[in-house]
Amino acid sequence: MPGARDALCHQALQLLAELCARGALEHDSCQDFIYHLRDRARPRLRDPDISVSLLTLVVTACGLALFGVSLFVSWKLCWVPWRERGLPSGSKDNNQEPLNYMDTETNEQENSEDFLDPPTPCPDSSMKISHTSPDIPLSTQTGIQENCAHGVRVQRQVTEPTSSARHNSIRRQLNLSNPDFNIQQLQKQEQLTGIGRIKPELYKQRSLDNDDGRRSNSKACGKLNFILKYDCDLEQLIVKIHKAVNLPAKDFSGTSDPYVKIYLLPDRKTKHQTKVHRKTLNPVFDEVFLFPVPYNDLEARKLHFSVYDFDRFSRHDLIGQVVVDHFLDLADFPRECILWKDIEYVTNDNVDLGELMFSLCYLPTAGRLTITIIKARNLKAMDITGASDPYVKVSLMCDGRRLKKRKTSTKRNTLNPVYNEAIVFDVPPENIDQIHLSIAVMDYDRVGHNEIIGVCQVGNEAERLGRDHWSEMLSYPRKPIAHWHSLVEKR
């Protein structure tokens, strides 16, 4: 029956087509019929075919994703272990280290102990690149006379116009809510903010003990050969420096550029210096120096030799020193005495940096602290010319904070500058016990940065003379108290 129905439909369609071709039917009806035939002749996808296609596409995508995941897992599980098995065991051990926190803490403690341990007495390994220059002329060996201080006007540095405003200013800088200095509040803040900080005071005692042990076990850094003789007619001590042997190397080339400075202590104004001998550890000087001194004064004098390594662009390294005293006990003295002395290693803390004289005066009613920088002597030479360009910087300190700072003028090309300059700080009486002064002698450098020659402190937190000077100032108000202070390295 379905076949007969299809044949009947086919005949009906042919009949309609012939009628349209003859024009027996309307044109619009024929056009609708033609469009209907075209639509029936166009191939169409059935709904089941569309569903199967979509399902096939989804299955293919999932299969590709699973295939990629399987490849990645197989590479991780199989390829990486196989590659590591091909490497030697030593490289694997070096690349993979277990995370052992206990070992890490132990290593940090060992590193800190190594950091705190003092260097060896003769730092042969601590070398630096040295750029030498021609020998220092003898014209720079003469002592520098102190500048005449007569007629020098005292300069005052005053900042605020009224004492009440100045006192309020310093209270604001001290973060005080009332005139009384709240020590407990500052200590509480320090405890709260000090968690996790490195406390240097925990290591001071150990470093001092190490320094004492190092000095007791110090060994010589070479030998110095020189000749002493006293001329009774001219009352002169004749010193001939012959040579030095077995000096430690200070340069990367394994050599040094040594020279020797000579003082007849306690006088440091008369200084002699040998020429610089380049790239040698066994220099031969053969230079003669004269020190005018009466024979009766020899017992109280000391001959001080300082052996340095010369460097044009940085500080000269101190190799060591030799001190000779009790000349009258030497064999054959005052005739010619040939001596060999060990060059003793000294740290930078033992280097004589010079002295600074200043006075302190406090006026309780006005709340004014005046420090007058008078002069300095025997400062350490920082320039190639054998001199320095010193100035003094004074800082008002409180609990490690710098509240104010002032500085003097710069004195050119001298090791014995004279200033006579007053610096004034406004400190209320209730705060005078909580502050201290930090004084630094600086070397001015026009090209590079200014270098610190030495420092000293005065106040209740200072040591020895600095504390005594401060206490004497408070005991005698309105009276200038002057003292000499030795300069030390900045810590």
From Swiss-Prot:
It holds the Pfam family C2. Signal peptide: none annotated. It is found in: Cytoplasmic vesicle, Secretory vesicle, Synaptic vesicle membrane. Residues 9-31 are annotated as: Cysteine motif. Residues 220-341, 352-485 form the C2 domain. Binds 3 Ca(2+) ions per subunit. The ions are bound to the C2 domains. The modification Phosphoserine is found at S177. Ca(2+) 4 binds at D383, D389, D443, D445. Ca(2+) 2 binds at D251, D309, D311, D317. Changing D445N: In a colorectal cancer sample; somatic mutation. Its cofactor is Ca(2+). PROSITE patterns: C2. It is a single-pass membrane protein. The keyword Signal does not apply. Keywords: Calcium, Cytoplasmic vesicle, Disulfide bond, Membrane, Metal-binding, Phosphoprotein, Repeat, Synapse, Transmembrane, Transmembrane helix. CDD domains: C2B_Synaptotagmin-3-5-6-9-10 (cd08403). The chain crosses the membrane at residues 53-73. Ca(2+) 3 binds at D311, S314, D317. PANTHER family: SYNAPTOTAGMIN, SYNAPTOTAGMIN-9. Belongs to the synaptotagmin family. Homodimer; disulfide-linked via the cysteine motif. Can also form heterodimers with SYT3, SYT6, SYT7 and SYT10. May be involved in Ca(2+)-dependent exocytosis of secretory vesicles through Ca(2+) and phospholipid binding to the C2 domain or may serve as Ca(2+) sensors in the process of vesicular trafficking and exocytosis. This is Synaptotagmin-9. The gene is SYT9.
